[in-house]
Amino acid sequence: MHRPNFQFSVLSLQFSVLLAFAAPAFSQATFPTPTLTSISPLGAKPGASIELTLRGVDLEGPQSVLLNERTIPLKSVKPNVFSITLPADLKPALYDCRFIGRYGVSNPRVFEVTTLDSIDSTGANAKPDKALKVSLNSVVEGCFKSNSPHWFSVELKKGQHLTATFDGRRFDTRTELLGALLAPTGRELAHMRAGVLAFTAAADATYFLRVNELMYRTGDDYGYRITLSSVAPPAQRTVMLEDVRPILIGQTVRDYFLPVGLPQVFDLPFKAGEKFIIEVHSHQLGHATDPHLVIENLAKDPAGKETLKPQAEVADAPAIVPAPSINLPSRDPSYAYEAKADGAFRITLSDNFATTQPYELRILKEAPKLEDLIALNPILPGAKTKGGEIGSANVPRGGIAALEIIAPNRNALSEPLELKADKLPAGVTCLGGFIGKGQSLGYIAFQASADAPAGASLLSGIPHSRFVCYAVADATRDNVLYRTTGAPALGVSAQPAPAFVQTEKTDILEVAADAKLDIALKVTRHADFTDALKLKALGLIDIAKAPEADIPAKAAAGKFTLDVKALKLAPGDYGFILQGPAKMKVQRNVDALAAAEARLKEAEEAIVKAGNEREFGKRIRENPKPGDDLEANEKALKLAFEAEAQAEADKKAASALIKNINAKSPPKDATFIVYSNPIRIRVKEVAKK
């Protein structure tokens, strides 16, 4: 007789319950959404089979991970540990690793694919005599579980190079690594600076590498992955201060800033009537730089004597208005110019932060045809303390969700921009979006059908996304770390939406600049959601002053009044979206609960089956017939009693687990984000009287 192997299942489920209780830290919105706080290992070889540990919240119903656009199935080994096999054709690079499960897709964490062998540091190598032996052209990976340093030994021949590199920000960890290379005598020979330790051996010897976290912080967030290379870092190009390099319209120079803020100089000739844009890209490429751009008019007399007259000294890029939900400053300057006569500019470029980080100097003939869009996960406004939230990029079933879109490097002459995205998850429709002329912020919305399957895909049409790396409760007490990466992923959550809002008309709504516009709204509600809604208009003005739509409790319709005159909207086209909170009860750990209920049902069925077999055997015992095998019947009867007892015990255990899950994770109010479809308006000139 089949007896369910229930004991292990109960233990597994109990672990799952404990791991899935917490809601995303510090978030105004508390609806279930997968959040990855760390992963390990931080990398592997193409084609490797590894056990991947995923830490975070709401990691229920695991399906797969996304490595950029590649979907890799997950096979559960134990709670939050999964077996995966990397595709053999993955190219060596840094990838965005995202979890996909019941509630959609998580934020990304960095995962490196490399052809180098990897050595794991468990932390047992906390003293020099316990140093872990490593070799050149390999990777060392570990995590600081205690404040002790990690020690490694490496054999080097005279003249061999050792370059050890690690950048915690690049790997999306909190680790700030200190590293030192020591001689066999213990004398320090080289130190890690800006994530690089470079050393050339003066003699054959066994050298020691010591690494520790800068402030001796510990925990799963403090991992590292150091590449040990035999190739010396490239020598910096020597540029004399008197060097002046030519540059032409349409060209891009890629180089490094000079040490201690020394300037680099370029001459740019132009003809009358030419239009061009001078752009410096460094800070927005992820470097901690503050480029300084000085432009002067260059003239030469017949003898070749130069005369310089100031043209412009360009500061940081202007702040985006209205401000996005995630801080997105740009310290990269740009300057647009239309030449009235033939001439030349003397361009001087340096870094106010005096780094030697990379930069790009672009001389564009015109604004790029394809906007360099950046997607942000919008959050609910109104937090009393300004912090950092990871946000969500998941559409609930039967609901609408939106991504906030930033178009950097735009100016007053930038053309309107229609927002589109392709390669959507199954069951999802793109509702589009809009950024007006000269504006830099907009919203693109997506709607999921009521039966859309949980899943995710990497969107096309939006090249970049920006994330808060770690949730921060108070940005005045802790730094909010951001990371800009590739295209955003959009997920579908199996959790139904409490409501979504639609305008009765989806075409462009026209209004005079001195008038009010009434917009009729339709509300589709979940059966369990009857509360009133207060929605803010995002994308027009600063969120603190944004107009609101109030929809009464239980109402299926409402109205949004836009006072264009009060908002001082200039004539032109605008796009915005309505967003607000909605509370609805949600029970987390539904997978654990469903599994426990399935075990309970299995145990109850086993009780019935064993009971029937017991009664059948008792009837044979009490009223035997010729030909009955009484000995076999007694054995079967004994097994039936044992099976029934085991099934009763399994039922008791399953019932206790269900009670435990419901007690620890009862249905609770969760705050969702409710959206409308994107709304377009056209503000017209006031009619002359």
Tell where the protein language model's regions lie, with residue ranges.
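Aromatic sugar-binding surface patches on proteins
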Residues: 77-83, 328-333, 438-444, 554-561
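Charged, low-complexity interaction regions
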Residues: 619-630
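Ser/Thr/Pro-rich low-complexity tracts
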Residues: 28-147, 212-248, 254-258, 350-358, ...
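Short, basic, low-complexity termini and linkers enriched in Ser/Thr/Gly/Pro
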Residues: 3-21
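Short, solvent-exposed loop/turn segments enriched in Ser/Thr/Gly
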Residues: 47-52, 91-96, 150, 398-404, ...
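Acidic, Ser/Thr/Pro-rich low-complexity intrinsically disordered segments
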Residues: 31-79, 88, 92, 102, ...
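Short, surface-exposed loop/turn segments at beta-strand-coil junctions that are enriched for proline
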Residues: 85-91, 198-204, 216, 338-342, ...
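Sec/Tat signal peptide C-region and signal peptidase I cleavage site
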Residues: 23-27
